[in-house]
Amino acid sequence: MGVFNYETEATSVIPAARMFKAFILDGDKLVPKVAPQAISSVENIEGNGGPGTIKKINFPEGFPFKYVKDRVDEVDHTNFKYNYSVIEGGPVGDTLEKISNEIKIVATPDGGCVLKISNKYHTKGNHEVKAEQVKASKEMGETLLRAVESYLLAHSDAYN
């Protein structure tokens, strides 16, 4: 087994606490509403949203795969940090054991925030992670972030 690390950052004009509430804490409800072209629904399979919770994320028809199951590993309300692992479905299977993800939302001096994202692809055997896979994951994250950001800009009273 190998581990391939990928890190990226994305900035937003939304304050860190507000982004954490909307994108992380209420993302299961908000994201399918604001980005149905990317995620059709999220089902809570087990747990209360904290560590150990299992969620099934369903994708719309025509998407490369039907679903993924995520396991919540950590929710840090003080430091706006969220860790989860993709444990089933989607790219996980013959070549990947899991994908561990960490999202940390940090306030910026201008009142916005930066999302620091770390992805660890745990491969099976000697398999390597393809650049297209990383690119698709980054594009999906950017799509979801911008959809949430647009919603928050249009609804200034939400998630304060």
UniProtKB/Swiss-Prot annotation:
Alphabetically ordered keywords of this record: Allergen, Cytoplasm, Pathogenesis-related protein, Plant defense
Chain segments annotated as transmembrane: none
Residues the entry annotates as binding brassinolide: K55, Y82, Y84, N101
Chief location of this protein within or outside the cell: cytoplasm
Pfam family, one: Bet_v_1
Entry's localization field: Cytoplasm
A single MF term (Gene Ontology): abscisic acid binding
Leader peptide range in chain numbering: none
Record-linked InterPro entries: Bet_v_I/MLP, Bet_v_I_allergen, Plant_def-hormone_signal, START-like_dom_sf
GO BP term, example: defense response
Cellular component GO terms held in the UniProt record: cytoplasm; nucleus
Entry-linked Gene3D superfamilies: 3.30.530.20
UniProt record similarity statement: Belongs to the BetVI family.
General function of this protein: May be a general steroid carrier protein.
Subunit structure: Interacts with brassinosteroids such as brassinolide and 24-epicastasterone.
This protein's name: Major pollen allergen Bet v 1-L
Gene name per UniProt: BETV1L
